[in-house]
Amino acid sequence: SAEMQAKSNPGDKKSTPKNPGKWLDIASLIPREVRHAFPEVLTWLPQDALLTKADIAAAKKMGVELSADDDNTIYIPLVDRRPAGTGLIFAANYQGKDFFLLMTTDKKLNISSVSVLHADKVPSAKGLKIYNQFAGQAVNKVSISAKTPLEKAVQLAVKRAGMLLYVRLKGA
């Protein structure tokens, strides 16, 4: 059909073969916060990070406990068809309450930034100064000296997220 060839959406009256819209644009599947972290990037490769038993065992050998609960999606920005880094949204847990962080890395998997994405259940997580301390560290060698229980929760979450990136992308 004409809709199929033009990649228009037959379920949307505004999407016609002459004006299909962006409904098939892969960038629309990338969270806004991740896209904003790489503003120059137009092409993305979302990659499911489903941990295998080998991944979990490799992480454990490096001192990090991962489980199937850590499965996630890694957002890989592409520049000239090559990976330019990664973006990962992940949960941290403090006193039984989840809050969400965004980690970005460069193409060598060194942390560029860690920031709070959503912390309504743990508002005190928003004002921590600890996030800047991760910048420049390799994802598989995260270390800081956390002083408070909340900082320790952030450190553990970043360490686990970093290891997830490492075992899935480096094949540790």
Residues covered by each model-derived region:
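Intrinsically disordered terminal and processing segments
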Residues: 2-100, 106-172
